[in-house]
């Protein structure tokens, strides 16, 4: 698409500012298809909103629990775009989805509690729950053709199970869940009394042929123990502004989130300018989100076509997110070793599977980010193909 080509990417700025395994942290000449972040600038309306607010020079204390307009906009977007009956009074703005996960864990977990975490899944589930003193048990993510199955989940629940981490859409697999499986998860929560940490940070990044189903569509009565986290980094490309929120379905759980967040004491909380940017994103930025989904759809389809013709690698078709999760077991290489080889010899950086980022269930895989131009992605895949051809021809 015209708005998402190399012409729109300022590589000099990325080399200076884009950290977390990206352009500012790799040697010159290396292409980073690593952390799930955009290579493109955010919507111009966000820049205009920040510039307009800053020019007056006033940055006073604001509402401890977030700007009312921001909370209303969040609830409205959840209702309109995801069919979630969210009330603004139960939405707590927070400084990033990652921080929101920690707030949920701190609010509802005690040392000695057990938590079920899918394997593989983003490491922040394990990190936030462990930080709160909980013990982690892993549930193997069962990838079906068109969804991740929850079959057998009940067998992993014990009397100590206090919380389940639920990534919807799933990172790194990029897959969704059926309504039947969501109903099953809520039924288990009602039966055993555990909480659900419901991560929906990827819920706007849905490919055109797929449909996102949310736990919250079943209504607040079914979601009494569901705590949802949302962030702006994937949807709007503003990771450095650290904009997110957590939301509950009742006053009791909301109050616990507020207490754990420490916003009323002003120790915690989201800053003023992040909320100004967040309002602009929600009120004026979704057109760009929809355009961006078209871009990543083209990138996904191109990447899968290229990978299908490469030796030693295969990849399922994701329904959501802007990452792909290829299987590289045929190469016979450990993912960490392959990623190091790619970076040092072929000048391509990607994310290895394994314990560090996604859990032991991600062994034999790598993750590749698609949130860039076709030109950058094409060259990155050229380098991946060259590496794999060299490896497989030497076997």
Where in this protein do the model-derived segments appear?
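Glycine-rich loop-to-alpha-helix module at the N-terminal edge of alpha/beta enzyme cores
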Residues: 57-59, 73-76
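Phosphate-binding beta-alpha-beta segment of Rossmann-like dinucleotide-binding domains, i.e.
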Residues: 79-81
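Disordered, acidic Ser/Thr/Pro-rich linker "stalks" and the adjacent N-terminal cap
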Residues: 11-13
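Short beta-strand-loop-alpha-helix junction that forms the active-site gateway
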Residues: 15-18, 372
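Short, surface-exposed loop/turn segments at secondary-structure junctions
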Residues: 60-62, 290
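Extracellular beta-strand ligand-recognition surfaces/modules
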Residues: 1
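PLP-dependent class I/II
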Residues: 4, 9, 25-31, 36-53, ...
